[in-house]
Amino acid sequence: MPALLNRAFSSALTLSLLLAAALSLQSCSTDPGPETESASLSNVIASPNDKRQYRHVQLSNKLDVLLISDPQADKSAASLDVYVGSYQNPKDREGLAHFLEHMLFLGTEQYPEPGEYQTFIAEHGGNHNAGTGLEHTNYFFDIDAQYLEQALDRFAPFFHSPNFDAKYVDRERNAVESEYRLKIKDDGRRQWDVLQEQVDASHPMSKFTVGNLETLADLKDRPVRAELLELYQQYYSANLMKLVVLGTESLDQLEAMVVPRFSAIANYDTEVEIHGSQLISEKKLPLLIEVEPLKELREISISFQLPKMKPYWRIKPAQYLAALIGHEGQGSLLQLLKDQGWAESLSAGAGLEDRSSSLFSIDIGLTPEGYKQRKQLTRLVFAWIETVRSNGIEAWRYDERASLAAMAFRFQEKQNSMGYVSSLASLMHQYPTADVLRAG
């Protein structure tokens, strides 16, 4: 029989005290600061070794755009990230945001033929995709550099004049159903489903996110297409979007491509509700969840509910704790567990994060003996954390981490165009655009 996957949720008190200590070291932090700003840039801080040029512009409709000029790029790319996702599903329309993502690319007023955009991208050496998360929906593509403007001409109308052709509703509804069924026996999805069942019912994360034939069915006087249009018209507002465009052209040329095409997106000054409730009620904590996997897996994850960490991007307390807890050298938590014969691997960090909170998790790959001794192992983890808390956060260690981060920013490797723009478009919602290259 496969071993159990354990997920333990604890009060955040111990870890919060550690975070408070890390935050107190703000004055000791090493910040890349103006000295790392490329001389060729006016409003975006980049590594001095980054030869690309950047420009941030805000269009008349409040759409923030990051332009990237890279004459050496093999592919041009663009990404538009909407700060809206499954959290914005209507209560009785689970999966609607995901369904909208599917329906969006089925023709526009300017290019009415479904699949025309996809065909154009494929015929010119490119790729395209999209993804719906809890709070983001990200659309992106890359293409042979000389075809960027023509690709943008097809991409932009999806966000101001899509057709949402009714004759494709059944086809895309079945495509969503197929995605849902494909992951039913995936252990990661099964763990996620069990976690959602424990989330406070008032929190949007407690709801089913993918969608299927049942949740997307046409109801009496409520066809799903009509509700899809309502969701689009309410939330696909320029003030909730970030656009990143990378091309071989100059910044002025890129701006000339973008402004007329994306200024047409409507701005409703939409505000998104921020859910202040905790993911899991304090009354339920500490909470132990056991999941029997379909594959041979032995893992334990200990999670702590914390405030949103993104506002502390300059100080990076969660990253400091992740490095401290996830260290693998002599005297580390992992080494201690290995000496007991209980663990094979360990990682730590703030993973799930939304507009109001985050989860900091310690994930441990167990040996067969570690699985048997999982209760004792958990006690040992908490004892180790308490020892670190009692000893306090050492300024020299924090400064060392900050120096390493500054060095990594200075000598960062160049990413592929499509992944780069997709990541930046999402990060622009979290950090000041001037700092987005170094904040994440």
Please describe what each predicted stretch is.
Residues R181, T270-S332, L336, K414-R438:
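His/Glu-based metal-binding/catalytic segments typifying zinc-dependent metallopeptidases
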Residues A12-S24:
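Bacterial N-terminal signal peptides
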Residues S47-S79:
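Mature N-terminal segment immediately following signal peptide/propeptide cleavage
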Residues C28, G33-S42, V244, R397-G440:
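C-terminal regions of mature proteins
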Residues A77-D142, K207-N212, H327-S345, G349-S358, ...:
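M16/MPP (pitrilysin/insulinase) zinc-metallopeptidase core fold and M16-derived inactive scaffolds
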Residues E37-R55, E197-M241, I274-Q278, K308-K310, ...:
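Histidine-acidic residue clusters that define the catalytic metal-binding segment
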Residues M205-S206, K242-R298, L306-K308, N391, ...:
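An aromatic/glycine/proline-enriched structural segment found at the starts
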Residues L106-Q110, D142-A175, S356-E413, P432:
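M16/insulysin-pitrilysin zinc metalloprotease superfamily fold
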